[in-house]
Amino acid sequence: MISEKLQNAINEQISAEMWSSNLYLSMSFYFEREGFSGFAHWMKKQSQEEMGHAYAMADYIIKRGGIAKVDKIDVVPTGWGTPLEVFEHVFEHERHVSKLVDALVDIAAAEKDKATQDFLWGFVREQVEEEATAQGIVDKIKRAGDAGIFFIDSQLGQR
């Protein structure tokens, strides 16, 4: 049985993952509107991945005898700048999510819930990849400049 404290913390993370999903969907819509179909595709995939995290966390709570729930999800921004600015925002957002996941691991450790720690370590590892991927895209966009932005757009469309 999962503790109420840990259940509540993971439920908060479920809402955060759903907000992240909406954030990436908003970015996808923006890129579609701006004619960057590859960036839009990448963001849609990212949105689906974040929603998958929310489902996985909800399933985990239920398997542990807890109650999964979705709290209010705040509205996400809709106005974005250049592709570089958007991906810099993505990188900062992923760093924020990493801190949230790290805090969950700390709560699981304090609750002496090894099963939940094990479950959450998968997300810790994934966040390392998410940050590296976002930083890599930022770096590519900076190196490519305006002339290479459509090449990067086409690359990300192959995700």
UniProtKB/Swiss-Prot annotation:
Keywords: Iron, Iron storage, Metal-binding, Oxidoreductase. CDD domains: Nonheme_Ferritin. Pfam families: Ferritin. InterPro entries: Ferritin, Ferritin-like, Ferritin-like_diiron, Ferritin-like_SF, Ferritin_DPS_dom, Ferritin_prok. It catalyses: 4 Fe(2+) + O2 + 6 H2O = 4 iron(III) oxide-hydroxide + 12 H(+). Induction: Expression is induced in the presence of excess iron in an oxidative environment but not in reduced anaerobic conditions. Is also regulated by oxyR. Fe cation 1 binds at E17, E50, H53. Residues 1-145 form the Ferritin-like diiron domain. One of its GO terms (cellular component) is cytosol. GO terms for molecular function: ferric iron binding; ferrous iron binding; ferroxidase activity. Fe cation 2 binds at E50, E94, Q127. Its EC number is 1.16.3.2. GO terms for biological process: intracellular iron ion homeostasis; iron ion transport. May alleviate iron toxicity in the presence of oxygen. Belongs to the ferritin family. Prokaryotic subfamily. Homooligomer of 24 subunits that assemble into a spherical protein shell (12 +/- 1 nM diameter) that can sequester at least 2000 iron atoms. This is Bacterial non-heme ferritin. It comes from Bacteroides fragilis (strain 638R).
